[in-house]
Amino acid sequence: MDKIIKTISENGSFRAYVLDSTETVRTAQEKHQTQASSTVALGRTLIASQILAANEKGQTKITVKVLGTSSLGAIITVADTEGNVKGYVQNPGVDIKKTATGEVLVGPFVGQGEFLVITDYGTGNPYNSMTPLISGEIGEDLAFYLTESQQTPSAVGLNVLLDENDKVKVAGGFLVQVLPGAKEAEIARFEKRIQEMPAISKLLESDDHIEALLAAIYGDEPYKRLSEEEIRFQCDCSKERFMNALATLPKADLEEMRDQDQGAEIICQFCQTAYHFDQNDLEELIRDKS
């Protein structure tokens, strides 16, 4: 079971979220049949969405769009406050490019562009906020977004580790944020600890990477666990939703599908589920337009 653990330092100066998103990213890889770099890029963006949604309350949805100019194309993910996340990468077939230490690079395949966050509170007026991509490695881009757009100094680590067959071995991350009222000496101490932390990939390789992340973040600093919540890859698509989308098409288009194609098929971009609409389904929509 994937989870996010929310914590706060005992003095109330910082909060930290740590995530195990292994099954979430593994499910995304299986559904989209992504190659190595596409898997890591999509996985990191899914984790970024989970982190942002964890900051919200009520029935809020967070959409993250990584709009790069390179071969991956757009990466779109949507997370809600119930722990659900879905997403896709425009080009799932971008294969591996590794550093000397074996880490999968995604920045060169993301390229330059924008990091766009859409916050939907369910009121019909979603809030858009955008910052430039500074590295394309997603974690740094999320930290820059939080610091610039939300005016909250933040440290972020996200990664997806693959096995020798380029399948997801482990995925997770962390967010550390300064809270109002933190003293300069406390901020400096935490900044030093974050700078000296082992690489996120090393921490994820630990037997219990959740505890390894917390130990690296807090060191000897006392902290409280506020909550532990389940997170998962879960798409909210349905045949009814796509039926409603078909209903917006002109009557002539529906008649063409009925007569020439003997039906229609729609594949959900987010989870690759195929929905089939036979001639009777289309006839029902056509009658509604008469």
From Swiss-Prot:
The keyword Amino-acid biosynthesis does not apply. One of its GO terms (cellular component) is cytoplasm. Disulfide bonds join 235-237, 268-271. Under oxidizing conditions two disulfide bonds are formed involving the reactive cysteines. Under reducing conditions zinc is bound to the reactive cysteines and the protein is inactive. GO terms for molecular function: protein folding chaperone; unfolded protein binding. Its main location: cytoplasm. Pfam families: HSP33. The keyword Coiled coil does not apply. InterPro entries: Heat_shock_Hsp33, Heat_shock_Hsp33_C, Heat_shock_Hsp33_N. CDD domains: Hsp33. GO terms for biological process: protein refolding. It comes from the Bacteria. Keywords: Chaperone, Cytoplasm, Disulfide bond, Redox-active center, Stress response, Zinc. It is found in: Cytoplasm. Redox regulated molecular chaperone. Protects both thermally unfolding and oxidatively damaged proteins from irreversible aggregation. Plays an important role in the bacterial defense system toward oxidative stress. Belongs to the HSP33 family. This is 33 kDa chaperonin. It comes from Streptococcus gordonii (strain Challis / ATCC 35105 / BCRC 15272 / CH1 / DL1 / V288). The gene is hslO.
